[in-house]
Amino acid sequence: MAIERTLSIVKPDAVEKNIIGKVISRFEKAGLKIVAAKMMHLTEEKARGFYAEHEGRPFFAGLVEFMTSGPVVVQVLEGENAIALNRELMGATNPAEAAEGTLRKDFADSVGRNAVYGSDSPASAEREINYFFDASEICPR
């Protein structure tokens, strides 16, 4: 099994609901370690840069507006097959289609307000982690 790192974001809707601890607890119970974390309010520029691959799509402006609407918690998770495990814990993008017991089924309101984000591949994880964190901010444990 491969030890991987993945980026996770607790989105503004979940922060507003005060469920950060519940989200983190699920990661830790599943065996993932948090090796970096910070709470921040994304600027429009930072959100646009992070979601640049979606620029030009109909949902882009709404996504940027939502992600800048309140604070987020950005973290790096580490563990065996962390990318796939995090995606399994999150559940389907649409909470109505998410499996019981997943973060999105339990905490998300809609496709647009779906509580959490996670990297979808090793290449994305590396790029996204580097977008938010300097190497000195990551604390292997």
Curated annotation (Swiss-Prot):
It is found in: Cytoplasm. PANTHER family: NUCLEOSIDE DIPHOSPHATE KINASE. SMART domains: NDK. The lineage of its organism: Bacteria, Pseudomonadati, Pseudomonadota, Gammaproteobacteria, Cellvibrionales. ATP binds at K11, F59, R87, T93, R104, N114. One of its GO terms (cellular component) is cytoplasm. Its main location: cytoplasm. Major role in the synthesis of nucleoside triphosphates other than ATP. The ATP gamma phosphate is transferred to the NDP beta phosphate via a ping-pong mechanism, using a phosphorylated active-site intermediate. This is Nucleoside diphosphate kinase. It holds the Pfam family NDK. PROSITE patterns: NDPK_LIKE. Disulfide bonds: none annotated. Its EC number is 2.7.4.6. Keywords: ATP-binding, Cytoplasm, Kinase, Magnesium, Metal-binding, Nucleotide metabolism, Nucleotide-binding, Phosphoprotein, Transferase. One of its GO terms (molecular function) is metal ion binding. Homotetramer. Its cofactor is Mg(2+). GO terms for biological process: CTP biosynthetic process; GTP biosynthetic process; UTP biosynthetic process.
